[in-house]
Amino acid sequence: MEPPQCVEELEDDVFQSEDGEPGTQPGGLLSADLFAQSQLDCPLSRLQLFPLTHCCGPGLRPISQEDKATQTLSPASPSQGVMLPCGVTEEPQRLFYGNAGYRLPLPASFPAGSPLGEQPPEGQFLQHRAEVQIARKLQCIADQFHRLHTQQHQQNRDRAWWQVFLFLQNLALNRQENREGVGPW
C-alpha cells in the first residue's frame, strides 16, 4: 500500500501574504510559482476525518473562505459582525492596558542589547512567520495521520473480534460436523 499523495494536494496558504493574496515577489519566499494552488482535496479527508481546516484553523484565508460553521455572532457587537467560536458569548478582555505589557519578564532567548520597540528586519520576520506556518501545517498533517492510523487500528481490532465470533458460532452450530471431520478438506 503506497502512502497517500496528500501533501501535493494541500492548499498552500503557508506561502501567502497576510491579506490572503499570493506573493508577488519574483523568486522570493512568497512567490506563487513555488506551489500550485488547489482546493482542499486530501484523500485523508475522505476517510470520515475532519478536513484540514478543522485541525489547522482558517489559516490566512480571506474571511469569505473561512469555515463559519463553528462560529457565532458576538452579542456584544452585532453591528460589527465579529465571529466567535461556538459557546463563547463575549469577546475576550484585554490582559494588559497601556504599557503594562512591557513590565513582563523577557524570555531568555530575547537579545539583551535590542530595545523593546525595535522591529526585526522584514526578511527575518517573513522567514520566522513562514517557519511557524510550515510547522503548523506539518502538525496538522501529523494529527490527520494519527487519526487515520487510530481508525485503521480500530477497524483491524473489530475485524479480529468478528473472526473470533464467527469461529465460535461455527463451533457451536456445527458441533457434530466438526467432530466427524466433515468438510471441504
UniProtKB/Swiss-Prot annotation:
Motif BH3 per UniProt: ranges: 134-148
Listed GO biological process terms: anoikis; cellular response to starvation; cellular response to UV; negative regulation of apoptotic signaling pathway; negative regulation of autophagic cell death; negative regulation of autophagy; positive regulation of apoptotic process; positive regulation of apoptotic signaling pathway
Annotated spans, Disordered: 1-28
A GO CC term assigned to this protein in UniProt: actin cytoskeleton
Region described as Interaction with DLC2: spans on this chain: 67-75
Keyword Methyltransferase set for record: no
Tissue: Widely expressed with an abundant expression in pancreas, liver kidney and hematopoietic tissues.
Keywords: Apoptosis
Outcome of mutating D67A: Loss of interaction with DLC2
Compositionally biased intervals (Acidic residues): 8-21
InterPro entries per UniProt: BMF
Keyword Cytoplasm: no
Its job: May play a role in apoptosis.
Subunit composition and interactions: Interacts with MCL1, BCL2, BCL2L1/BCL-Xl, BCL2A1 and BCL2L2/BCL-w. Interacts with the myosin V actin motor complex through its binding to DLC2.
Protein family according to the UniProt entry: Belongs to the Bcl-2 family.
This protein's name: Bcl-2-modifying factor
Origin species: Mus musculus (Mouse)
